[in-house]
């Protein structure tokens, strides 16, 4: 987005990510951005690595916003310990809230690209397509920012996500 001339601000909250908790990252871009903080009901897009996290952050999404999520289910600690069950019907519930849902098997696409670690890039590809941005701009950014030995794998992961976002 910076290559398109936008002002971009980022904020991360790591919480207990080292112990299986979530990492929250807020990204804002526009002509002039004063703060990366996004209040409930203001996000255009929620991008999530798994269904429960997508549902958890749904209150941040504005009406008519887009949820881009991996279809993978990652059991949180209460489910792992048997204290709770993983909720069923999350994707349907997200759609029921009026969100435009883009759910894809990002894990399989990342494996197809060459590494399960590329799930994030697959999801970014799908998000980029939902934004209507040109694929080439993102591929050039990958070339500029990713270590050379991982460029082709990341470009493939991005492209697979971009195509799945159609």
Task: State each model region's role.
Residues 1-166:
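Active-site cofactor/cluster-binding pocket
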